[in-house]
Design a protein with these regions (language model features):
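DPxDG-like acidic metal-binding loop motif
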Residues: 34-62, 76
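Short pre-catalytic strand/loop immediately N-terminal to key active-site residues, enriched for Gly-Thr
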Residues: 22-35, 174-175, 210
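Phosphate-handling active-site elements
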Residues: 14-25, 49-67, 190-203
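Glycine-rich beta-strand-to-loop/alpha-helix junction loops that act as flexible
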Residues: 38-39, 177-182
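Conserved, helical-rich catalytic subdomain that frames metal- and/or nucleotide-binding sites
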Residues: 79, 84-174, 187-202, 206, ...
Length: 225
């Protein structure tokens, strides 16, 4: 009952007073506690899918408002486009970013998001960032660092291990932790071919998982919302 998929289905059913139910099968490919928004994207997918299956015809904004009740990241996945997000996830603005390739590493350990935000060492004094300022720079600029990374590294030392491992494989690369961790990522230089990337992934320590992914400007399910 606490799974976001189940909560999303129940929330939509209550909100619309829909009389029937649905059978939902979930196959998770994104590790839990990885900082990749796997649970939030699952919840968004359920809202999108059941909205169509049940012929509810709720608008994107209605679904996003419902999604916010499930978590701050859910509206982003319902928004379906590359976005600059503010507030508690309710203010989103489309931005244009290159569809770069990224190497994402899961260091075999999960981190509970609540542990990060409950940590006494978490600082909340980062200078505000505007959209124009962000777009005028590159995401790898140090001023756009992940404020959760130092805390996550103390809770889960594997985060720093993964960042150090990336530095060994791709020196001078701009690497970061994703979300609240524990995954880390790095933009893959365009000069690297598939064979070279495969060679890097073969060096992963036991228990780690690595994937080559590509940034998207739009969610494949965007037109379903």
């Amino acid at each position: 009952e606490n799974d976001l998929v189940v909560r999303a289905a129940h929330l939509l059913k209550r909100h619309t007073a829909y009389p029937f139910g649905a059978s939902i099968a979930l196959k998770k490919n994104i590790p839990m506690g990885a900082g990749l928004g796997g649970g939030s994207s699952d919840a968004a997918s359920v809202l999108i899918g059941l909205n169509r299956l049940w012929d509810l015809n709720l608008s994107q904004s209605e679904l996003m408002n419902l999604g916010l009740e499930l978590g701050a990241d859910v509206p982003f996945f319902l928004f379906g486009q590359t976005a600059f997000v503010q507030g508690i996830g309710e203010h989103l603005e489309v931005i244009e970013l290159p569809e770069d390739q990224f190497l994402v590493i899961f260091p075999g350990k999960s981190i509970a998001t609540k542990d990060i935000f409950q940590a006494e060492t978490l600082t909340r004094n980062h200078a505000p960032i505007t959209i124009s300022h962000f777009l005028a720079s590159h995401w790898s600029d140090p001023q756009f660092g992940n404020d959760l990374q130092p805390v996550a590294s103390m809770i889960c030392p594997e985060v720093n291990r993964a960042l150090d491992w990336i530095s060994q494989q791709l020196p001078n690369s701009a690497k970061r932790m994703s979300g609240s961790g524990s995954c880390v990522f790095v933009a893959v230089p365009k000069v690297l071919g598939t064979n070279e990337i495969d060679h890097i992934l073969q060096k992963l320590p036991s228990g780690w998982v690595g994937r080559l992914v590509r940034g998207l400007k739009q969610n494949p399910a965007y037109n379903s919302v």
